[in-house]
């Protein structure tokens, strides 16, 4: 045998040990807050924002995110803000695929991908806390529905591209990302609804 018993144990451990994902933050000279799971610049003053706890693992399947894990939070947010349960769930699926630690290239955070500049107005202290993120994200989407008079495609476009962008175009902005986003959310919405 080429690897022997130690090699087999090492390969087995690679598949069994859970991944770790500490979240770091820093504030730049303009006051912009940045989050990352990989601090890349040694000169930047990164601080640990969230220390990921090591979890027991039963193998690769135990690390999967299941789309029903946050249903109780979604139900509470849906009722509180008057947004349908399947729609909130569809937005979460499209935004983060139910990853509470998701960080987009543009800096959006958590399950509903809240932009850092919206955290204060949405009363979110910890954007990686599933309950806070879902409550704040649903509240923000309710604000978009109200602003765009309940028109779902415009509200989804505003959630994705920003309300001022939708105002500027007076319709869905002609961005492939936004058009694809609306289509994806609607597909998930109908799959959760029926």
Model-derived features: where do they sit?
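N-terminal secretory targeting signals
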Residues: 1-69
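Catalytic glycan-binding domains that act on GlcNAc-containing polysaccharides
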Residues: 39, 44-194
């Amino acid at each position: 045998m080429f690897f022997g018993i130690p090699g087999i144990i090492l390969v087995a451990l690679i598949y069994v040990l859970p991944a770790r994902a500490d979240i770091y933050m820093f504030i730049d000279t303009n006051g912009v807050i940045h989050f990352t799971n990989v601090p890349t610049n040694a000169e930047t003053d990164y601080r640990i924002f969230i220390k990921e706890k090591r979890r027991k693992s039963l193998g690769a399947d135990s690390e999967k995110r299941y789309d029903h894990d946050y249903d109780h939070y979604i139900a509470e947010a849906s009722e509180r803000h008057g947004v349908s349960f399947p729609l909130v769930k569809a937005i979460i699926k499209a935004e983060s695929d139910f990853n509470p630690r998701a960080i987009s290239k543009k800096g959006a955070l958590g399950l509903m991908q809240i932009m850092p500049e919206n955290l204060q107005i949405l009363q979110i202290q910890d954007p990686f806390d599933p309950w806070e993120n879902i409550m704040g994200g649903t509240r923000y989407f309710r604000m978009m529905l109200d602003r765009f008079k309940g028109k779902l495609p415009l509200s989804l476009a505003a959630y994705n591209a920003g309300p001022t962008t939708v105002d500027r175009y007076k319709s869905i902005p002609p961005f492939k990302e936004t058009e694809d986003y609306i289509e994806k959310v609607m597909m998930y919405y109908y799959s959760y609804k029926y």
